[in-house]
UniProtKB/Swiss-Prot annotation:
It comes from Mycobacterium tuberculosis (strain CDC 1551 / Oshkosh). It is found in: Cell membrane. Its main location: membrane. This is Uncharacterized protein MT2364. To S.pombe bem46 and yeast YNL320w. SUPFAM superfamilies: alpha/beta-Hydrolases. It is a multi-pass membrane protein. InterPro entries: AB_hydrolase_fold, Hydrolase_4. It comes from the Bacteria.
Amino acid sequence: MSLKRCRALPVVAIVALVASGVITFIWSQQRRLIYFPSAGPVPSASSVLPAGRDVVVETQDGMRLGGWYFPHTSGGSGPAVLVCNGNAGDRSMRAELAVALHGLGLSVLLFDYRGYGGNPGRPSEQGLAADARAAQEWLSGQSDVDPARIAYFGESLGAAVAVGLAVQRPPAALVLRSPFTSLAEVGAVHYPWLPLRRLLLDHYPSIERIASVHAPVLVIAGGSDDIVPATLSERLVAAAAEPKRYVVVPGVGHNDPELLDGRVMLDAIRRFLTETAVLGQ
């Protein structure tokens, strides 16, 4: 063995040890890198809309989750929407969305997952799925809601939660804002050097589930989204069954207000829901 090769071996070993240490750290801390909850406190629902109510959704595993409920005002049982938030903040960051959806004539349930908005527990794929099921059950049980006219709205990671829920409990319509194909694929956009498929504890495989959703689907993407590129949203809608719609909001990024309560997005949602049992006559 040459002297040069002898000197190279320790360098290779050091690089391997460092890489192994980085991967081990990321594996052990991955949920802290995926979920960014706000601890609260969250303001009252009535500070958003006068008729808003602070509610508690209880999961099968005993979690008591805070939420906001904004009932429609048309009388009788009517259409509603269940909102599944993205991976950051809490429901107060979606107040404008709740107001906008309520303005379409919908009752709106906006809830926080476990670990978010002062709720107990820690977020995980399995936990968020349980939270969404509990929220859907709560909303379906309201006297002013027609269970056959409930839509799901999912934002980013919440879109993956909504897809999983829709497979188990089909809605009247499914609206996905900035959805990705899988957590591994969106992660690879930001960390292409990591073997994410092997590392991830949570997967959110929407691309494998979307074809099993038996409901009309609307996908909305930001044309300049550098967190969840529109190409991933486009691939997801391509895998969905008909009827489906795909809308790109040009020049808009992942967290821009145009994807919270912007006119293009809301017009697309209104037109879409009017074509379904949610708002259709």
